[in-house]
Amino acid sequence: MRHDPMTPSTFDLFADAEPEQLPRREQIGEQSCVLRGFALPWLDRLLPALEAILAAAPLRQMVTPGGFIMSAAMSSCGTWGWTTDRSGYRYTRNDPQTDAPWPAMPAVFLALAQAAAHEAGFADFVPDSCLINRYVPGAKMSLHQDKDEASYAAPIVSVSLGLPAMFLFGGFERSDKSQRVPLLHGDIVVWGGVDRLRYHLSLIHI
C-alpha cells in the first residue's frame, strides 16, 4: 500500500474542487484498475493517522544506490519499511534514521487497503508495509517496477491524496508505451496478478 500525500496544510485545496466526470471504476489492465474517490469516505480517520505516522517517522529524501537524492520525500509504516541508500534498495524492520521499528500500520490503513484490494478482485490481502511518498510539483520517480518485495503474490494498492497527478502505467519493458491516467484526491490505483510487474510512475501537475 502506498500513499502520495501533500503536507497537512494543503489538504484543504480540494474542499471546493469539482472532480472530473470520470468512471467510478476504470480498468487500466487485465488485473489493474482505478477506483475513483474510493478513499474519500475514509479521510476523517485516514488523515489523522497519517499525521501521527509522519510525526513518529518524518518524511525524508533518500539517496539512491547511484548517489542521487530522490525528489520525492518518503516514510513508511508497518512491519517493514522501504528504504534506499548507497547499499541498495530494500525493506527494513527499523527506520534507518532512528533504528527504532517503523510505526505500526494504523487499522484504518489496513482496512482501506483491504477494501480497495477486494473491490479490485484481490481477496485476502494482508499488507505488512505502507510506503508514503510526498510529491511536490516537479517531483517524480523514474519509470520503475516494484521488485523489492519478497513475493509478488500481493497487489499494489496506491492511494492518492492532495494535488492532482498523472499516473503513467506502462508495460513489462521500460520502453513499452505508457497509459496516462489522471488521478485526483481520494483515487486509488490497484494492480497485481498478471499486471504486478508493470512499469509505472506518478507526476504531479497543477
Language model regions located:
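Short, conserved beta-strand element in jelly-roll/cupin
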Residues: 134, 151-166
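Conserved small/polar residues in nucleotide/adenosyl-binding loops
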Residues: 204-206
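Conserved metal-binding segment of the jelly-roll/cupin
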Residues: 182-198
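A short beta-strand-loop-beta hairpin characteristic of the jelly-roll/cupin
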Residues: 164-183
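Signature of the catalytic double-stranded beta-helix
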Residues: 73-130
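N-terminal auxiliary "cap/dimerization" subdomain that precedes the catalytic jelly-roll/cupin core
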Residues: 2-74
